[in-house]
Design a protein with these regions (language model features):
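Polar/acidic, low-complexity leader/linker segments enriched in S/T/G and N/D
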Residues: 1-28
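Short beta-strand-centered interaction patches in the first periplasmic/extracellular domains
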Residues: 1-2, 87-109, 153-247
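Short acidic/polar beta-strand-loop edge motifs in secreted extracellular
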Residues: 22-23, 30-36, 111-135, 153-183
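Surface-exposed, non-catalytic interaction/assembly patches
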Residues: 31, 110-127, 203-286, 522
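Short coil-to-beta transition motif at edge beta-strands of beta-rich domains
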Residues: 61-77, 463-478
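Surface-exposed cap/loop segments at beta↔alpha junctions
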Residues: 65-154, 243, 511, 515
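Short beta-strand and beta-hairpin "edge-sheet" elements
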Residues: 73-103, 194-196, 222-225, 475-497
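Acidic, low-complexity/disordered segments
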Residues: 100-102, 116, 251-443, 447-561
Length: 561
């Protein structure tokens, strides 16, 4: 993985102003760089301040040559390794300076539309005979970007038998490419999307493989100047209903038989529940975990028996048709008085009838076995439902009081994704989303004393050496709650031209990745706007239906439609 990690917070930056085609126009003094914001999941941002006038070599005040060259949509090349696109120029006449905001080049993907309707994709390969297309080729043709490194666990479904490309269905997509990559692709392939703006390459990393090293202990005694903590339970979820495509059976794919999954660990760990309820939940989870493998084996056995039964029924259908055809042939021979051939055909019919009997017996036995297997599955489902769940001694785990108390901790949300073709993939994705949502979001914004000035030159093994990365774990001493908190480094802002005491701000969060599935008002407005545009485009259809269906006149319809 390249350059996710902050190997050092250096102050030596090389800035070049470029045209849209990346042709270099001129250099930008590093003193103009006001701030550089890096984030694990958001678009990186650069702030540049350019003075209108500068002092020339002769000591006279002259117009800054950069002044007329800095234009929107031009690029800034940073350290010959990445590009930022200029989006905002803010001129302050009172200060005779231009404040420039530039975003990492993938920002432009947020201005390119993608619309898909019932399209199957592999990431890097295709099977067009089966109408499965190559997303890499399609992305390159539409945007000029292509995939680079992809972790095997992202690209492939890996089993004991080997690996095969993951297949995803995108049934209704109408958004921008940046959102499609950072939301749909990141979610359905369980990956972190990283953009190489120098080469216009998209890198996909398994979310579980990205830097989780414990790197540094922060407290007011060493690096912290000031600390602000924000916590919120607005989006907390303990029960998540899973909705896939129409062909997916969620209820039949989970041992509890519920259309949802649950996680009450936050309230249990904080002792907000009674001891009786906590004990019941722990025992319930233990018994579900014990019964899960038994249930999975029964489901597998049922699938095998169903497959065998289907094969035998197909064979029996063929036998029925063969017997019918042979009887017709026999009647023809009998009509023509061909006794010899009639006897031969009779022997064939007898043989087929014997096969028919054997198949009917086997099918009946399979159906009886399937009924028994289904009864066992239903019994385990019953034992895994809260109201009827029992412990190893057959005693009910929950009583009316604990069940009523549990209702106080239900916070529902629906996770919907029709891209998955395998219900297990949908359930795993739902578990990841619930894992992000089942406890409050807590973030810390810190002003930090510059790390680099505190690093000792000697390579003493207990001394922090200055390596820290987005996604790394930081142990934070929060004196207000008198606890050491383990948090992820998710964002940082570097101000290279400030003094060391003010040159770095970092954001820490108990959630490594932000939950992108919580719908905001802006999302709803955008979806509504798109729907209205489509409705307007097809308005003639509705008008025809309204006034001309089945040759009924407008007067006959009246004003009720």
């Amino acid at each position: 993985m390249k350059r996710i990690f902050l190997n050092k917070l250096n102050r030596d930056f090389k800035l070049e102003l470029c045209k849209v085609n990346k042709e270099v126009v001129c250099s930008i003094p590093k003193s103009c760089l006001s701030s550089l914001t890096r984030s694990l999941t958001e678009i990186d941002k650069m702030e540049i301040v350019i003075n209108k006038y500068i002092t020339g070599l002769d000591g006279k005040t002259v117009l800054n040559p950069l002044w007329k060259e800095v234009k929107e949509e031009r690029l800034v090349c940073l350290n010959d390794s990445e590009y930022f696109v200029i989006k905002i120029n803010n001129f302050k006449s009172s200060e005779n300076e231009l404040s420039v905001t530039a975003y990492s080049l993938e920002y432009k993907l947020g201005k390119i539309d993608i619309a898909l309707e019932d399209i199957y994709f592999y990431l890097m390969t295709s099977d067009e005979d089966s109408y499965i297309y190559n997303l890499n080729d399609y992305m390159y043709s539409e945007t000029g970007w292509k995939f680079g490194h992809i972790d095997d666990s992202v690209r492939y479904d890996i089993t004991d038998e080997g690996k095969e490309d993951k297949l995803r269905l995108f049934s209704s997509v109408d958004k921008r490419w940046y959102d499609f990559l950072t939301e749909d692709i990141a979610e359905t392939f369980n990956c972190l999307v990283v953009f190489d703006t120098l080469n216009k390459i998209v890198l996909l990393y398994d979310v579980n493989s990205v830097s989780e090293n414990i790197q540094i202990y922060l407290s007011h005694d060493n690096y912290i100047k000031s600390l602000e903590r924000t916590s919120s339970t607005d989006d907390i979820v303990t029960r998540m209903t899973l909705v896939g495509n129409e062909e997916m059976d969620i209820i039949g794919s989970v041992v509890t038989g519920y259309p949802y999954i649950e996680d009450y660990s936050y309230f249990a760990n904080n002792k907000e529940m009674s001891e009786n309820l906590i004990s019941a939940l722990n025992k319930y989870n233990q018994m579900v975990a014990t019964r899960q493998p038994i249930w999975e084996n029964l489901i597998k056995l049922k699938s095998e028996k169903l497959e065998t039964s289907t094969m035998r029924k197909n064979e029996l259908f063929v036998i029925y048709e063969e017997i019918r055809a042979l009887k017709s042939i026999k009647e023809s021979y009998a009509f023509n008085g061909d006794t010899k051939n009639e006897v031969l055909v009779m022997a064939q019919i007898t043989e087929k009838l014997d096969q028919q009997v054997l198949l009917e017996i086997e099918i009946k036995e399979l159906e009886e076995e399937l009924i028994q297997i289904q009864d066992s599955i239903d019994n385990i489902n019953l034992l895994c439902k809260r109201e009827t769940a029992t412990d190893e001694n057959g005693n009910l785990i929950f009583n009316t009081k604990t069940l009523d108390e549990l209702k106080e901790f239900i916070y529902c949300e629906t996770y919907s994704n029709d891209s998955f073709l395998n219900v297990k993939d949908l359930i795993e994705a739902g578990k990841r989303e619930l894992g992000l949502s089942c406890y409050p979001s807590v973030s810390y914004t810190l002003d930090v004393k510059n790390f680099m000035s505190r690093i000792m030159v000697e390579n003493f093994r207990l001394q922090w050496q200055g390596d820290i990365g987005l996604g790394d774990i930081v142990i934070l001493r929060d004196d207000d709650i008198n606890e050491d908190v383990l948090l992820y480094l998710t964002d940082y802002v570097q101000k290279p031209n400030e003094d060391e005491e003010n040159s770095l701000e970092i954001t820490l969060s108990n959630k490594k990745y932000k939950d992108k599935n919580i719908r905001t008002i802006a999302d709803k407005l955008r979806e509504g706007s798109t729907a209205m545009k489509k409705l307007t485009m097809k308005s003639y259809v509705f008008n025809n239906v309204k006034y001309n269906r089945i040759n009924i006149t407008k007067e006959q319809i009246g004003g009720n439609i």
